[in-house]
């Protein structure tokens, strides 16, 4: 019996709270009875505007609350990564996503380049691209933020015994935090072909210490709720009821 693995995750039902053209997809437990399912769906449809479904719906956090800094350790000099080639069909999709990020105010054309990283892409399940940056060189030069992070095993214990657990993911949550203006130029990245070079105005996912910066901000915002009504691990939230 040692090789028998217990299935612990509930079966999930995918539901669309939006339209066929503008989908707003979430998931509910497959263990709900018909009455519970109807109540949950009524609640979700009524309050769906409480959630952000796309970049323009996100609001930035105040710089007075949090900014992400990019300090550089002594002995490290700016580094420019060599350019990479990409297929033409991928380049066209990258251009679309770059334009979307510019419209959202997340990135802007790079004006002063010291550090220069390459862009890499990830194809999501829906066929769209996620823009990622190879920040390995500047990450090596950045000192570690020793902010204490939650312990996952303890969080599991803290949510046990509750009847309903609601799981939420911070949609592009890192992108709600500004990069300190003096450090923005260090995030410069190169796109393929003639798309150009850009820099991040907000905090991207692949920067060292981004998780610590986000956790610090969330602990400050939800300090009177964490432990009582919710638990949080970086951008993953569990509401207990």
Task: Give the role of each language-model region.
Residues 8, 16-241:
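Retroelement reverse transcriptase polymerase core
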């Amino acid at each position: 019996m040692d090789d028998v693995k217990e299935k612990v995750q509930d079966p999930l039902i995918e539901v669309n709270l939006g339209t066929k053209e503008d989908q707003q997809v979430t998931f509910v437990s497959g263990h709900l009875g018909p009455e519970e399912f109807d109540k949950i769906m009524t609640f979700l449809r009524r309050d769906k505007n409480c959630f952000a479904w796309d970049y323009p719906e996100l609001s930035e956090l105040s710089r007075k609350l949090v900014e992400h800094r990019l300090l550089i350790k002594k002995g490290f000099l700016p580094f420019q990564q060599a350019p990479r080639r990409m297929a033409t069909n991928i380049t066209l999709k990258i251009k679309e996503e770059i334009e979307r990020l510019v419209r959202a105010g997340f990135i802007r054309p790079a004006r002063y380049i010291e550090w220069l990283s390459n862009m890499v892409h990830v194809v999501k399940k829906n066929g769209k691209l996620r823009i990622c940056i190879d920040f390995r060189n500047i990450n090596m030069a950045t000192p570690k933020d020793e902010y204490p992070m939650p312990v996952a095993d303890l969080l599991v214990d803290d949510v046990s015994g509750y009847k309903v657990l609601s799981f939420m993911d911070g949609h592009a949550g890192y992108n709600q935090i500004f990069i300190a203006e003096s450090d923005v130029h260090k995030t410069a990245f190169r796109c393929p072909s003639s798309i150009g070079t850009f820099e991040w105005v907000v905090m991207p996912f692949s920067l060292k210490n981004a998780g610590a910066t986000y956790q610090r901000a969330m602990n400050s915002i939800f300090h009177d709720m964490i432990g009582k009504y919710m638990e949080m691990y970086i951008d993953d939230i569990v509401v207990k009821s």
